[in-house]
Amino acid sequence: ATALDVSEKALKIAEENIKNLGLSKKVKVLKSDLFENVDEKFDLIVSNPPYIPLSEKATIQKEVTFDPELALFTKDAKGLEFYEKIIKEAKNYLNKNGYLLFEMGIDQSKEIKELLETNGYKNIEIIKDLAEIDRVAIAQI
């Protein structure tokens, strides 16, 4: 398995968690901005990209602001900036019949499903969270 992030701080925390779980020999940690430093293919790609538009920063729940801004906010108006990139690029890093899975924000599922369909993904499934909000997208290439 490979774990990647653009944040050095996030990677250090991931490395500690991997070590504490006894998975150091099974998980490679890599600093990468999306797929920038990736040179292999996977059966599954899981992502929790930033999806809150920066314009909504003042109105979000206080609990959310404990995470670093880099992990939360996008510069575009709909919060879809990273999904567009991931959906387009992941096809090059997924094995045949591989899966892409990611968390999404409120009211983003329709656009994300359309992006997946437009980019040739199949078996698209949207999963709701405990509050019955569309929260996870799963798709197969």
Features from the language model and the residues they span:
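Mobile active-site "lid"/loop adjacent to the S-adenosyl-L-methionine
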Residues: Y51-F82
